Structures are given as C-alpha cells and as structure tokens.
C-alpha cells in the first residue's frame, strides 16, 4: 500500500495475542472472530493449547493467523539441550530482557542458539498449514536489533511479509528512536507493517471504554489494536497476567457499541494480508 493510500483511509487490524496459551484464550478468539470485530490472532507454537488453537484456526478460514514468537517469559520450542544458554532447567525463557538483550548482542554462541529457536518456531508454524499473516514477538522483543535482524533474515525463508510495529501515540520519548530504527529496517526489507498500535499502555485492560476512546480519536493510516481476551475461568492464565481483565476484553470485542464506533470512524477491518494486498492465499478482502 502506498503512503497516499494509507492517508486516504483508516484501516484497523484487531489482533488477539497469545493464541494457544490456554483453551480459555482459544475459545475467546473463536467467539470474538465469529461474533465480534476480531480479525487476527497471533499463535504461540510452543504453548500448552497450541494444538487446539491450530484446529480452531483451520475451522475459521477468514481468521488471519500469525506467529507470536516467544523469546522471553515463556516456553521455548526446542528442548533445553539444544539451547542451554537461553532457557532454565524447565526449558523456559526468563523475563530479564535487559540482561538477555546484552547477551544476544555480545555473545556469538547465544546468538546462534537464538537463531535456532527462532527458526524452530517459524518451522513449527509452517507445519500447521496455516498461511502466515504476520509476525510479532512476546513483549515486543523485536525492538532489540539482534532479535529483529534474525527474524527478518529467517522470516524470508518462511514467507514473512508483515510484522507489528509497536508504535503507540503515548510511547515514551526515549523509545521513539528505537521505533524509528525498526520502521526503517522493515521498510528496507520490504516487510509491511502497521502505522501505529493501540494496546501497549492499556495491556490487559483493553475494555469497551478504552476501545471506544481509541476509536473516537483514530489517526489516518493502518492501525493494529491488540488485546488478550479469554473466557472466564478459575485462576490467572500466567503469573504475569494476574491483573488482566481478559473477560472484559472479550466483551469489548463483542460489543455492538465498538462495532458501531468502527463504522462511525469510517474504518475497514482485516488482517495484515488483507490490508497489504496479500490476500491471494485466501482471497478475502477487508470487511
């Protein structure tokens, strides 16, 4: 899409992250897509309910599914003995992203293992048989130049055409140069990306009120509104999600008021493939 085309319209991609984390998430994704405004979901290929998520996705041919690369605070795809420098005894990444970022940048053997894990997750997604709509990372780790470089390099082998640019209007000033570098790198590589996101400042709290406020002040261009819906259940999905309002986020995606606000804003909806003209895999246009 040309710059002029972006400015001529408002286009929204509604994405659910952590698809596959739990069946409660998967059920919410299915409901929000069939009966609400959700257009896309990002799959965690090593998550406990990934198989269930994949089965649901195959039943939902208009749901655009991408790869949610997990390189922090989650389970790795490869066994621990293949990537011992990356994971703990249980095969999980920790959440000290600053320390890991330094290790990725300065230690060649760590970078090599990181590349192996990234490729393994791409390969696992390819084996699902689902078209790859987009790629993003858990906790936006692709803001790190080493991580981004490996994703761009490896993603070419798997038909990656679009990535999330985690650029929100209220981002801190110190982050703007990093966002600019990511944008430039994606543009040079010919990888499509959104112009802005909604969801960082209110992660876990993307309620109806938050969505209505965002929709009332939409800029022109391509926006991605991402959230973490799940149906009601016992206990937190993860330790880090204890305060997340998953059910309220699902209700927001199902809200007739939200759907009406999208129409009032003159915005169309779709996945990355729809928005950026890659719909040849399924032949569906933005709604």
Identify the function of each model-found stretch:
Residues 137-139:
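Active-site histidine-anchored catalytic micro-motif
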Residues 1-16, 23-134, 145-287:
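Terminal accessory/targeting
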């Amino acid at each position: 899409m040309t710059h002029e085309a972006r400015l001529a319209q408002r286009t929204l991609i509604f994405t659910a992250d952590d698809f596959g984390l739990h069946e409660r998430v998967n059920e919410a994704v299915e409901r929000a897509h069939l009966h609400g405004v959700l257009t896309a979901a990002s799959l965690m290929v090593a998550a406990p309910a990934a198989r269930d998520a994949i089965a649901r996705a195959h039943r939902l041919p208009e749901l655009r599914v991408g790869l949610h690369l997990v390189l922090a605070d989650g389970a790795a795809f490869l066994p621990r003995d293949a990537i011992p420098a990356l994971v703990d005894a249980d095969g999980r990444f920790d959440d000290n992203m600053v320390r890991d970022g330094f290790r990725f940048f300065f230690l060649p053997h760590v970078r090599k293992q990181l590349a192996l894990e990234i490729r393994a997750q791409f390969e696992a997604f390819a084996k699902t048989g689902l078209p790859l709509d987009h790629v993003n990372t858990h906790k936006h780790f692709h803001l790190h130049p080493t991580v981004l470089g490996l994703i761009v390099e490896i993603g070419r082998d798997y038909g990656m055409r679009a990535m999330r640019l985690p650029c929100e209007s209220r981002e801190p000033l110190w982050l703007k140069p990093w966002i600019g570098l990511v944008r430039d790198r994606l543009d040079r590589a010919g990888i499509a990306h959104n112009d802005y996101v909604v969801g960082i400042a209110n992660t876990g709290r993307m309620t109806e009120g938050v969505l209505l406020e965002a929709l009332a002040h939409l800029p022109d261009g391509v926006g991605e509104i991402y959230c973490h819906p799940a149906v009601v259940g016992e206990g937190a999905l993860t330790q880090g999600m204890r305060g997340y309002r998953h059910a309220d986020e699902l209700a927001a995606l199902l809200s007739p008021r939200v759907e009406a606000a999208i129409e009032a804003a003159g915005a169309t909806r779709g996945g990355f493939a729809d928005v950026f003209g890659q719909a040849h895999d399924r032949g569906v246009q933005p709604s």
